[in-house]
Amino acid sequence: TDSKLYVAMNLSFACSLRMGEILGLTWENVHISDEDIAADNAYVYIDKELTRASKRAIETLGEKDIYYIFTPLMPNTSTRIILKKPKTDSSIRKVWLPKTLAYILREWKKSQDELKGFLGDEYQDFDLVVALPNGRPCEDRIILKEFAKLREDAGLPKVVFHSLRHSSTTYKLKLNHGDLKATQGDTGHAEIDMITSIYAHILDEDRKVNAQKFETAFYAKPDLRSVRPPEEPKEP
């Protein structure tokens, strides 16, 4: 699979990041030193997102919410790729990394630096973690196209990239036994309703399993198969 897609998929699933947050992540906000990893303190800090916006939307957002406007390859285009502040304050957050993902990011940084050295001045360094080979920002349509191809090649059901973030939320709620606040801290949801809804679905699935276990543990016993409910007493 394409390396940047591999990195993006891991960030989405392990860190519960949105697409714009993945594409807007910069290396200055990735903390993966030997000390960080050894102390289980490797993390990414999410404080911006990458998106494409119209000139009018850019004017509406204003300077305080936009960190950077990328120069377009085609000057006459009516939209611009921008790095901007997330929509809600709850989206600004620290998300801790599993060790494996920390090492994946280190290897990715190493290969990115090698490419940067090879291209020299042709590499446009914006400090982006998930970038095109020349360093320029990678738009969501590129990741979505690569993800769709990977899914089709693997013969998997039709799922979208965002499913990884949803699955991440579900998996974390199972692992932490329903710690809604800790999960919300990772996902950056402004309201806890979404997390609660996902957890309610998990509980329903677990309760189905309870019924199956009860069937195996109780009703499947040979001496219980012939048990019948007591007959109603006959009228004298």
Task: Label every model-predicted segment.
Residues 25, 108-111, 175:
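Residue-level signal for well-ordered alpha-helical positions
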Residues 72-82, 88-156:
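Active-site/catalytic core of tyrosine-dependent DNA strand-transfer enzymes
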Residues 1-19, 23, 37-41, 90-92, ...:
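Basic, Lys/Arg- and aromatic-enriched nucleic-acid-binding interface segment
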Residues 33-36, 40-43, 48-89, 101, ...:
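C-terminal secondary-structure termini that scaffold catalytic or DNA-interacting sites
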Residues 31, 45, 94-96:
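Generic structural detector for well-ordered beta-strands
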Residues 24, 32:
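Phosphate-coordinating loops and pocket residues in cytosolic domains that bind phosphorylated ligands
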Residues 38, 48-52, 187-213:
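Catalytic-site neighborhood detector that most strongly recognizes the C-terminal catalytic loop/helix
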Residues 10, 14, 21, 142, ...:
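C-terminal catalytic core of tyrosine-transesterase DNA break-rejoin enzymes
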